[in-house]
Swiss-Prot record:
Residues 558-571 have a biased composition (Basic residues). Its main location: cytoplasm. GO terms for cellular component: cytoplasm; NatC complex. Keywords: Cytoplasm. Belongs to the MAK10 family. It comes from the Eukaryota. Residues 548-573 are annotated as: Disordered. It is found in: Cytoplasm. This is N-alpha-acetyltransferase 35, NatC auxiliary subunit. The gene is NAA35. Component of the N-terminal acetyltransferase C (NatC) complex. It comes from Gallus gallus (Chicken).
Length: 725
């Protein structure tokens, strides 16, 4: 039966879900079942009435509403106790504000830490940290340890929120910055709070020392327990102070503050084992007070902020368990320590690689934000000291050695040439800062943003080529032996290709591609993007060598002494080698997929509303804004990858064999790399088993089986280990 209600001044909020409560309210119920059914008869079979006010947001809300996992409002219908706020709980005597015992302090602090972590993982403050009544108004608290801790947590939340907002690398699924009008302890200074925490810490340390066992003395179990509990409170208070001091250090502009943060993180890490071992000393939540909700702890009320939540209830916040708390903090500390290392880098390319590698770990929103604000400080200088323009010039020098940036070149002091290069470098700042900021977003959002930034880099590419041409014609008049062709253009093209490659590869990590799409993704990478990347790197290497030769000749002319020639390690050689390995891995996967398709092992969808061409064009749509390299359209791809142009056309066994050779080649390249890193070892873990599997398939193993193979992406995100089922 469908009912329509006219509700007059009803204040029962989410309690309307209970039928007995509906009966008590001043509601005049009207049966509209008949009217509704008659209205529905006007619609044809399968037809839906879509009101313009009923958009996607309302549709999602309708799906989520009253689902206990998605709708936080559902908990309210299952609770029979009276929900009290902080002041009411104090009057009622259900909460202690003075003389808290050590087990009570430990239990409350641990639950607070769990709420803090849950907030950092994307839930709202109202459903997490502010379910702790002590945090609502620390002025009411008389217990010094609890008061200092509550203020410390508020300050940590406030500074973390400020950092995340400033870095602007979060989306709605990452972080919720709303404070719901709660006071964030703004009336108390950061210094005062750290001082209060230090006082409690010192007091606890005295108690720890006074209860410590003395040599030759028989130990009283009660004194030993008190010693353990005091040590547990001391560790938690000190951890709170250290974490707060670290966040304060990151707000300072001096680079020395980063070293200070690194030191403090080591102190925080040392406290974790004591916190982990003493979790058992804290009071536990009471289980019998509620149904369907997490158990209630003294000082906590999960439903206290229910009316502050938006009308479409947010998802139910599952507070993490205490056992997971220490593990999370341990990883957070490691991430913050890694963030501190970025200030040791001087080259823009190394910084970009650092951001890429850091992002691959899928770090939390706080550590991502700290990395962003450490890199580009308020004064818009890198690490607060270097101009971004200077970083771009250094990157150009180390990559292509353009003559215009060489002090020994005639263009170096030419005003017009200076204007050209300065204007170009200034135009580079925004796209490169945006690119670094993109690497601060979560992995799924990054991919979307990489597709958009290609437009900016395409414009930059066009400008680079024009500046190159202008500088080249100027240089020819004065130094005909030197060239300025494709110097700046090569550098921008290199970054363009890196973005395109990253865009395609991230689709494997995010599991966006179906198995039948793998072949054209790997083809585009191996035959096109990696081929372009290697020629770009080779061109940059040649440009460097040409500039070095000119410099050497100039040196020879000045000095009559013979210099011993040392074999110099080429700066780009490792990257060229890695690109060759990646190209071989992609080529191996492409040929594997074509062979599987020939053997009928690839399940293809029955295309009705789309086709392979539509999917292909959708996958490579962002590349249409790029002029160099020109995008490969579907018909062009089909023509280029057509096997019938070979005489005789290769069979599946030939392709499996060719694929095994590609994997073998990748293995050889990688095994010759000195000091292999994790990435090299990860690719080897894929290449080696794939060589064996391809050889088996080439020999006719399971040829008649139509069961699709399995692709295991666990050893490497972009290249799977092929498994025969």
């Amino acid at each position: 039966m469908v009912m329509k209600a006219s509700v007059e001044d009803d204040d029962s909020g989410w309690e309307l879900g209970m039928p007995d409560k509906m009966e008590k309210s001043n509601t005049d119920w009207v049966d509209i079942t008949q009217d509704f059914e008659e209205a529905c008869r006007e619609l044809k079979l399968g037809e839906l009435l879509h009101d313009k006010l009923f958009g996607l947001f309302e549709a999602m809300s309708a799906i989520e509403m009253m689902d206990p996992k998605m709708d936080a409002g559902m908990i309210g219908n299952q609770v029979n106790r009276k929900v009290l706020n902080f002041e009411q709980a104090i009057k009622d005597g259900t909460i202690k504000i003075k003389d808290l015992t050590s087990p009570e302090l430990i239990g409350i602090m641990d639950t607070c830490f769990c709420c803090l972590i849950t907030w950092l993982e994307g839930h709202s403050l109202a459903q997490t940290v502010f379910t702790c009544l002590y945090i609502h108004n620390p002025d009411f608290i008389e217990d010094p340890a609890m008061k200092a801790f509550a203020l410390g947590i508020l300050k940590i939340c406030d500074i973390a929120r400020e950092k995340v907002n400033k870095a602007a690398v979060f989306e709605e699924e990452d972080f919720q910055s709303m404070t719901y009008g709660f006071k964030m302890a703004n009336s108390v200074t950061d210094l005062r709070v750290t001082g209060m925490l230090k006082d409690v810490e010192d007091d606890m340390q005295r108690r720890v020392k006074s209860t410590r066992s003395r040599q030759g003395e028989e130990r009283d179990p009660e004194v030993e327990l008190e010693h353990q509990q005091c040590l547990a409170v001391f560790s938690r208070v000190k951890f709170t102070r250290v974490l707060l001091t670290v966040l304060i250090a990151f707000t300072k502009k001096e680079t020395s503050a980063v070293a200070e943060a690194q030191e403090l993180m080591t102190q925080a890490a040392d406290l974790l084992s004591a916190i982990h071992n003493s979790c058992i000393h804290g009071i536990q939540a009471q289980n019998d007070t509620t149904k369907g909700d997490h158990p209630i702890m003294m000082g906590f009320e999960p439903l206290v902020n229910q009316r502050l939540l938006p009308p479409t209830f947010p998802r139910y916040a599952k507070i993490i368990k205490r056992e997971e708390m220490v593990n999370y903090f341990s990883k957070l500390i490691d991430r913050i320590k890694t963030v501190c290392e970025v200030v040791n880098l001087t080259n823009l390319h190394c910084i970009l690689d650092f951001f890429c590698e850091f992002s691959e770990q899928s770090p939390c929103v706080l550590s991502r934000s700290l990395l962003q604000t450490t890199f580009l400080v308020d004064n818009k200088k890198v690490f607060g000291t270097h101009l971004m323009q200077d970083m771009v010039k250094d990157a150009l020098r180390s990559f292509v050695s353009p003559p215009v940036l060489s002090p020994k070149c005639c263009l170096y002091n030419n005003h017009q040439a200076k204007d050209y290069i300065d204007s170009f470098v200034t135009h580079c700042v925004r796209p490169f800062c945006s690119l670094i900021q993109i690497h601060g977003h979560n992995r799924a959002r990054q991919r979307d943003k990489l597709g958009h930034i290609l437009e900016e880099f395409a414009t930059l590419q066009d400008e680079a080529e024009k500046v190159d041409a202008a500088l080249h014609s100027m240089l020819l008049k004065q130094e005909p032996q030197r060239q300025h062709l494709a110097c700046l253009g090569t550098w921008v093209l290199y970054h363009n290709l890196r973005i395109m490659i990253q865009y395609l590869l991230s689709g494997f990590e995010l599991e966006l591609y179906s198995m039948h799409e793998y072949y054209y993704i790997y083809w585009y990478l191996s035959e096109f993007l990696y081929a372009w990347l290697m020629s770009t790197l080779s061109r940059a290497d040649s440009s460097q060598m040409a500039e070095e030769r000119i410099m050497e000749e100039q040196q020879k002319g000045r000095s009559s002494k013979k210099t011993k020639k040392k074999k110099k390690v080429r700066p780009l050689s490792r990257e060229i080698t890695m690109s060759q390995a990646y190209q071989n891995m992609c080529a191996g996967m492409y040929k594997t997929m074509i062979a599987f398709d020939m053997d009928g092992k690839v399940r293809k969808p029955k295309f009705e509303l789309d086709s392979e061409q539509v999917r292909y064009e959708h996958r490579f749509a962002p590349f249409n804004s790029v002029i160099t390299p020109p995008p490969v359209h579907y018909l062009q791809f089909k023509e280029m990858s057509d096997l019938n142009k070979y005489s005789p056309p290769p069979q599946s066994a030939d392709l499996y064999m060719a694929a095994s050779k590609h994997f073998q080649q990748a293995k050889m390249i990688l095994e010759n790399i000195p000091n292999p890193d994790h990435e090299v070892n990860r690719i080897l873990k894929v290449a080696k088993p794939n060589i064996v599997v391809m050889k088996l398939l080439a020999g006719g193993h399971k040829k008649d089986s139509k069961v699709p193979p399995e692709f295991d992406f666990s050893p490497h995100k972009y290249f799977p280990v092929v498994k025969l089922v």
